[in-house]
Amino acid sequence: GGHSLLLDGGDVNTGVPESDLQDAVPDFKGMNLLGYQAMAVGNHEFDKPLAVLKMQRDLAQFPMLSANIYEHGKRMFDPYKVFTVGGLRIGVMGFTTEDTYKLVLPENVKNIEFRSVTAEAAKVVPELRAKVDVVIAATHMGHYENGNHGTQSPGDVELARAVKGIDLVVGGHTQNPACMKAENVLDRAYVPGTECKPDRQNGTWIVQAHEWGKYVGRADFEYRNGEFKLVKYALIPVNLKKPVKGADGKTTLVPYTEEIAEDPDMLALLTPYQAFGQQKLGIEIGASDGRLEGDRAVVRAKPASLAVLIGLAAMDKTRADFAIVNAGGVRDSLAAGKITYKDVLKVQPFGNTLSTVDLSGSEVMDYLNAAAKMSVGSGAFAQFAGVSLEISSGKVTNVRINKAPLDPGKTYRMVINNFQATGGDGYPKVSDHKSHVNTGFVDADVLRAFIIKHSPLKAADYQPGDAVVRR
């Protein structure tokens, strides 16, 4: 027996080229078929123009929820939805990271406010409590260990600590399993298929099913005599596989747990969309003799070869002296072997354009110092190409461009993407600088052309080496 609610923590948009090409229509239709009942609005929902988001909201046969997004002073989405499940009244409210405004293009969020989550929750929770037995928050704010959110906006832990009366948070955004090793200590070595202990803060359970559909999170609760009790929780791997070496020395991929069979109705729904995407994106454009590193955990923490490639491609196209690449703009690695246009779009899915700005040497130093302060682990983390430097305590020294020491009186051309140029990720806004030019060159197209021109790529040519030293 029992009853269920199927919820999502947001970010349906961006990252899968076949989906991006089709404005996530196949994703929303698939979610409709699965019977989703509500989702939080994620920051990536604003990667495309508002007309696309509003089309998606109409397409979804379930509410997209966010209590803290306001358009022209009014809530853009429903703040919550009340469900009656087995005679129990359950209120599901939605919240979106306050960082959204700096994670997307400014023109996509014009006249939109991302208000304080805790302030909005302090209003919504009492309102819901008067109507329901159980309060759940579907959020896209992130799970930060012990509430240590650094330069990011507050996440689920901080929400639970600040606002009493939330029974469960179903979260997203930080892309981790949110399994705990001890109180306020994340299990950073979680193995798929093993026990996952959810976080608990101020009487609120907090769960997050990692990323990209790798898991379905299942939380079983009982409600008796006014008490909402967690009976068990599991992260169920969705056909995740691990490499296993056989007696013959060959490595094969084996499921962590029992394989889940394809659903014929879902397959029939999605196959035409997949075929259309493959037709458009499966063209081989080049090859690389080695892996070019762009994985999230690497590119947001230290210099990475794929970011160097992206920066050099942008420099080549715009005749710039150096490039700064925000780590959040690098979404995947390029494996050794053939490279398709789809691979490029997985790396750079946002359709950003390249911006150039001609700066004096002293202006360059100011900008580099600002970039150097971008925190490790965030999408703002700065990657560099064409420049060598040392960073110590957030200060930049020993800057060399074109292998020569930085000259305060000389003019240098910097290339970044238009998102950074307009102040995205907290970068200094340079779009109003007298020399700023939005070239209109789309980043993925520039990378594609560079790969075609220089293929086969020699991975060794793009290794960051010791060009950027952090002390």
Where are these regions (language model features)?
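Acidic, metal/ion-coordinating pockets
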Residues: 1-241, 268, 301-313, 354, ...
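Non-catalytic terminal accessory segments
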Residues: 1-4, 130, 230-231, 238-471
